[in-house]
Amino acid sequence: MSDSPFFPDHQPIQLPKIKIRRPKVGPGAITIAVLVLLGLFVYAASSFWTEILWFQQMHATRILLTRWGVIAGLAVVGVVLSVAVLRIMIGLAHRHRVSSKRGEAAANLRQYQDAIEPFKKLAFWLVALVLGIPAGLRLAEGWQTVLTWLNATPFGKTDPIFGWDISFFVFTLPFLELVVSFLLHLVFLSLIVSIVASYLYGGLQVVPRPHATAPVRRHLGILAAIASVIIGVQYWIGRYSLLTQSGDNIDGAMYADVNATLPAHSILAAISIAVAALFLVAAFRGTWRLPTIGVVVTVVAALVIGGAYPALIEQFRVRPNARSLNAQYIQHNIDATLEAYGLDDLDYRTYDATTTAQPGQLREDSESTSQIRLLDPQVIRKTVQQLQQSRPYYSFDSGFFVDRYTINGERRDTVISMRELNLAGLSQEQQNWVNRHTVYTHGFGVVAAYGNTITSDGLPAYWEQSIPSKGEIGEYEPRVYFSQSAPDYSIVGGPEGTPNQELDYPDDNAPGGQVSTTFKGNGGPSVGNVWNKLLYSIKFGSTDIFFSSQTNEESQILYDRDPLLRVAKVAPYLTLEQKAYPAVVDTDGDPSTPKRLVWVVDAYTTTDSYPYAQHQSLSSSTVDSRSQSVGQYIQENSINYMRNSVKAIVDAYDGSVRLFQWDEKDPILSTWMKIYPGSVESKQNISADLMGHLRYPEDMFKVQRDLLTSYHVRDASDFYTGGDRWRLAEETSTAATANGVSTATMSSLQQQAVRVQPPYYLTMQMPGQQSAEFSLTSVFVPGGESKREAMAGFLAVDSETGSEAGKVREGYGKLRLIALPSSTTVPGPGQIQNAYDTNQTIASQLNVLNLSDSTVIRGNLLTLPVGGGLLYVQPVYIQGSGGANYPVLRFVLTAFGNRVGFAPTLAESLDQTFGGDSAAKVAGGDQSADKNKGGGDQQNQAESEPSKQLASALQDANQAIQDGQNALKNNDWAAYGESQKRLNDALTKAIDAQKKLDAQSGSGS
């Protein structure tokens, strides 16, 4: 009879006995199984073994094996511990099983027990593995945390609350949180598994009333006590995490955190330990009442002491007195933020700028005015593409960069770019595997132009150009096998004496119209044997690699060719600059060897655990109107500590990577150098030539300038009121539009950032600086909702590293901030742009160009603190209609105070602004350099006449406008009519001249 009151005649369910027959395994099945296993092994090897080959070729095997070894070790520890604990929990539940219970539920459980009994060991291990493996793998995710804790380097600075060294928060605290999180997860999982297993084996009863046998009670009680202890530890270490937490506006522990939340965590930790003791008592004394009360008390205490009490303190104690009560904690935040981001040595001064422009005012600023950069790297890309591309399969996709080179003994600002390979430029007939992966393998050379000089036709004045490369650089290795736009892989190399397969560069005088070459370096793993060819065929999904006759015993496969990716792989702990920039340098200091073409990569060590420092989002701080993408090699998006600790170079020919310790005081880099000894070279190994091309990194500067919109205020009380907040100036140039940038595919963050003016590299002298130096600059305007565009501050950092081997020039990295007094209104970039737009002379002349179907493109608006005030300079480019046309520099806009200038040359424009004679020294007097032809002698000669006609016509139009205005003032209608006739004639001539220039530029490629 059944014990069930509802179904008295119900009989227990009888499970049918199933006889399992073992299938016969024949030789065919064994063969198939072996082949499947072999296939899986080869497929796996195409990933892990090719990765080993890549790191071996890079001489960085230790970096890979250390990472893999630690990950594997932690995974094994985590999985073994998790699986073992869970298996023990299930085994204990089975050992403490009860088989004498009566009733329907007990009968059904016995049937489950009987059914699983023959396979119990397998079932127990299977459950432990299924649940334990994912739990254990969680530990491996913290491999970097474990390594840095084991090799931690002290910061030598302490936090203001506990007095611990900063390294505790950066290295030790994350490790403790990792361990506590893993253990707590494992204990709770063990509790759940133990409860379920004990129920299935009768040791735990749910109905008609909860009941546990003594062994099960001890089992669960001890587990609950362990969980309670771990929770107590979690509360205790949570006290330290308060100092690194993010706040609504200010990060770190404020008054309520220190005086309410922190003590609450201590109390809750003590309560948790007490509850653990109650669980132990219950485990051996048989009553659950006390631990149940303890759990309830813990929950209530967490809600009241940990939640409600701090909230009440914040609402009724702090908010009415926040300025005074939070003052010392805000000061902690200010001090820590300045230290964490390298802003503690900022040179801050008030700049009483004049807005009056007078003749001769720039006489004392010749060092700055002579290096005013007229070439906008963003705008001239299309110009250089048309004139220097040479063939459709070349491009300048990585962009143009501002650098400085010594030419004829003079240090000159330069705009430079690599000529990279672009397979998209091949015709459809050329798009075959042989061409894409064995013939078209590399780009060739660089194009470099003076930053402050143009030809008479508005073209860049090149000092290095053409294929083969010719100019002022001298002998260097020009082949670009490694770049951002390089093919996904190329197969290169061959024995001595075999025919060259790779296209080197086009040459009309060579057989077939091209010169061929063979790669001679050590740039990639070998594919000279069947095994490697098989692995790489699978890796890249191409049978051509395996069957191609183009490969030989000396063949190498080049892949992972993006310079940023190569640095990221050999230094996975670094956050990288969004872009690498090119340089032609003597890397070994030996003048007898050719120079090398390299990519320079700035790299950072970051953390989000610096106590009291303000958190910054890298994805928002580093995006502006000209970098409308977020770097993909960001290790941490939210950070509160940043150092430019490493300078890396990637050889464009063989892809070799060298890392140099740039910041020798950074504890985070020192820690990683202990982990990977020998992977980072000393700064002393930097050659003199390479040192001269390093610079202050742009992304670091962007983060710093973003912080200085608020943290230029050093007093806690003033900081809290926020009355002197700034914001970054908005972009005024039209370069982004000219280069086809569309906001349609941008995120909301990027659409907002598109308005922010980027920082600019230029040579200039700041107030208090001894001489003009290569600098990185940015402009601030007042914050708030008023959207005033007046100038509020100007920031510059000394970016000149010097040219002494192994030694950085004194003064490098010095940040200088000048603040404009509120009593003086100095026009900001937006107001200057408005002055340009509303100036009748400027507007009329630009309208003439628009009438001729040309496009007016305004370049970067540069700001320089010269003449006792602030000078603005903006190049104006004209681009004809049609896809083959390109921008040429036709005019220069200048402004100082309320005076503006607009003329074909910088010198003329400055003279207009400063009453006829600025006394400024500019490049070549009128910034033209016909001896450095921008597009070839014949083109310059052809363009000279229309250029002169356009300039003359615009001058006539300007004069006619002025005469007409004077005639109106004098009510001389006859003179006004005559001036209008002259204006119409001048406009007609200007339009005709511009059309001729457009036609010539359209055929200039």
Functional labels for PLM-detected ranges:
Residues D3-R22, T31-N970, A974-S1003:
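Soluble extracytoplasmic regions of secretory-pathway and membrane proteins
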